[in-house]
Amino acid sequence: NMDGLEYKRTKFNKWVQKFVFWEERMAVKHSHYLIADNMGIRDYYKEKYGKESKFLAYGADVHEDYDVDVLKEYGLGAGGYFIVVARLEPENNLFMAIEGYLASNQYGKHPLVVVGKTNTPYGKYLMERYGRDRNIRFVGGIYDFRKLNSIRHYSYAYFHGHSVGGTNPSLLEAMASGCFILAHDNIFNRAVLGENALYYGSTDAATEMLDGIDQAVSAHKKEYTERNLEVIRRDYSWEKLVDEHEEYFKWMLSQRKGG
């Protein structure tokens, strides 16, 4: 399973990136079969290496047991905040989301809640730069899944800035939690969300998107969230995906045994 474009992760220095890219080439060359968790990743390996891969995604469960009282712990109100849940690394585009928010008409109206450990080098940088702003709230990692799903569910909108592929589990969880999603514009996110999200590719685009977010929420939130929930139930249920993995593994074994 090839995961994402690991060599593009900016937490690695240039030498490590080159080594990881070499690992990618060796994996493609020497593996009998490749698995891609995202159609964008599958297309990448086809175009770059001429190698086919099997699309087998991750999954998520649709939840119904949300607890609005969880918000009190963070001083939040239902529908009254933006949220981003991510590892605080450059390739997840926290800077783009935060700077876009700061320049928008939503700054001071709805706080931006950042969920993720701040003890990474980039997390420390973000804390130093933005941590004193009362409208940007770094709450650390949240590992109580029910609590995290509730905080996602009651958000006004959810930023998803991941950019190096493939299918990020936190995106599926946001969809399964009924979030109105604001996604970084790349092939991996579009492969999952299709037209059921708003997209931004720069700080200015994020600002423009947020300046019109109230109208977008009124016009599209119900439609987009319902469609995303249907996508999770149809394409990303664990029962379906476990069956697909089992079938593919059986097929691989049959090939190794000569059919």
PLM regions with names:
Residues 124-146:
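Nucleotide-activated donor-binding/catalytic signature segment of Leloir-type glycosyltransferases, i.e.
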Residues 176-183:
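Short hydrophobic beta-strand element within catalytic cores of glycosyltransferases
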Residues 16-33:
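Membrane-proximal helix-turn-helix segments that form the acceptor-binding/catalytic region
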Residues 141, 149-155:
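Short alpha-helical donor nucleotide-sugar binding micro-motif in glycosyltransferases
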Residues 218-257:
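A charged, aromatic-enriched C-terminal amphipathic alpha-helix characteristic of glycosyltransferases
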Residues 72-103, 113:
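Conserved donor-binding/catalytic core segment of Leloir-type glycosyltransferases
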Residues 162-163:
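Aromatic "clamp/platform" in nucleotide-sugar-dependent glycosyltransferases that forms part
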